[in-house]
């Protein structure tokens, strides 16, 4: 039997964890544990997309399958570049804690699917398939015209992507340099951008339930700038 401490439906990638363990078991039974972890992640993503009907990306599956702290470049979705980031949080006298806010992501498939769909809508405006292919300066130079598509949330989500991709590189650089204070600053900036621009903290269709928002507010009150 399989047992897990991953909370179901709480946004902690419980489905990716399940897919990974099944893939790893099959790798052990029939392939002497030789199946590449990234391939296991891709198989898990396919299963979730096709058989479960959730249009998830590959990030959660890679995190579960490869393990540790990783940096991923999805430019070539068939061959994502995955690098492990060697860091020991205890060295910096920090622990990563998971707070159970009692929220659920179980019925948010449509909300989740809207994020890449809206970003692709912005990319299509510039005749590109993916937003990462759009020149950032060209986007901001034409932001008034882009708003004419009638979806300001898509515009805000595009702003998040442009800044977040740069933040990821800076976060990895900060960890490699041992600058944990800079890493924390960048992580907080990432969270703030997710809240304001990506808007993935609560569902606009259910504004009365904001358990993650409450968790963030209380964490900020307890931790302050620490």
Predicted stretch roles:
Residues 1-88, 221-225:
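Gly/Ser-rich oxyanion-binding loop with an adjacent helix/lid
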